From Swiss-Prot:
Swiss-Prot/TrEMBL keywords: Allergen
Highest taxon of the lineage: Eukaryota
Name of the protein in its database record: Pollen allergen Sal k 1
Lineage per the UniProt record: Eukaryota, Viridiplantae, Streptophyta, Embryophyta, Tracheophyta
């Protein structure tokens, strides 16, 4: 899955060992709508 958050693009990938899923996180600054990546993933 891809999660997009907030201004200019910054991309990182992490692996959820529990679900066996790779997430592509696109973080944009400023990102006022979330507090943590975990919140964004939910």
């Amino acid at each position: 899955p891809t999660i997009t958050i907030g201004g200019p693009e910054y991309r990182t990938i992490f692996f959820d060992a529990y679900l066996g899923t790779s997430y592509v996180i696109v973080i944009k600054e400023p990102a006022e709508e979330f507090t943590t990546i975990s919140d964004a993933v939910k």
